[in-house]
Amino acid sequence: MNIFTTFLFMIVIGAVIGAATNHLAIKMLFRPYKPYYLFGKQLPFTPGLIPKRRDEVAKQVGVLVMEHLLTPEGIQKRFESSEAKQEILHTVHRLIDKGADMEITVLSLLERFGVSHADVKADEWLHHWSDRKLASLLKKYNEQTLSELLPLEVENKISSKIPDAADYILKRGIHYFESEEGKARLGNMIDDFLKERGMLGGMVQMFLGNSSLIDRVHPEIIKFLRNAETKKFLTDLLVQEWEKVKQFSLQELDDKWNVKELAYSVKKQLLSHFSTKVILDKPVGSYVSEVAVDLKIYLAPVLVDKGIKAASNALEGLLAKLKFEDIIREQIELFPLKKMEELVISISNNELKMITFLGGFLGGLIGAIQAIFVTLF
């Protein structure tokens, strides 16, 4: 009975000591959370292992993650995988569809982003920009001739239309002088001509009479205007003048006919019929829906590919600038020790219990061996 009691006692004591030792060792991984002092001296094993080495652990985890887990090569491989491309492409398609369904106007959308009266600002910008652009162009081509400024096809087109212009002028002249107004104007011109000639004019008017003179001159003028030689003469005259005008520089044209002022007037007149409000006061979806199919088929794949390539090329530098290892280290250092302890225990609770039981088993086994030695010796 004494031997059995000794065996049982030593086995129980050994098991309790072994289990308690392992349990205490597990607890000492985290506890105590802070150092304790006695007579100004820090007590051993305070704080626990992980609290004491937390800064070093945080630093090593950060280095481990960046050098072996979150590497640029691994992220690039993930980025450039077909699955990632398809997922990004589907996301872009959803955004396009969402844009096509937007009923808010462009003006209202811009106002949401802090851009008020965008139409007025756009019109003002357009007017100022067109003024600067036109002034720059006029200055640039100031010394060039009209022949140099006009495209060859335009110059040839104008030259080919000169006979038509001469014919039109003569026809309008015939039409005018055949009218009562034209005939009356012709009579007034004859009267003025004769008055300027003094006595000689008076004598002619006395012999022929004003009506007789008009009746004689009027048919001759119409005949002159209908004559083919007159048309040829006028055509040649217009051609000669056109050749002269083509050699004028832009500055010379402006000096003679204020063409620069005319250019500004034409520009102003054209812009007066255009307002960006007509464009900006429409729903965003009306614009997106018109090009949604083309955006999905042509633009989206190209943008996704180029975006992934650009991101991959810039990834290594970006990760270096972001310093993820420092972020990981800082987060681990700020993570509450109690939460960390609960997290580790919740994950490995069964394994930690088995370690405690193993300590008890080994302690009991050692106690049994000691009991044998005590009994025998």
From Swiss-Prot:
It holds the Pfam family DUF445. Belongs to the UPF0754 family. One of its GO terms (cellular component) is plasma membrane. The chain crosses the membrane at residues 1-21, 357-377. It is found in: Cell membrane. InterPro entries: DUF445, UCP032178. It comes from Bacillus pumilus (strain SAFR-032). The lineage of its organism: Bacteria, Bacillati, Bacillota, Bacilli, Bacillales. This is UPF0754 membrane protein BPUM_0927. Its main location: membrane. It is a multi-pass membrane protein. Keywords: Cell membrane, Membrane, Transmembrane, Transmembrane helix.
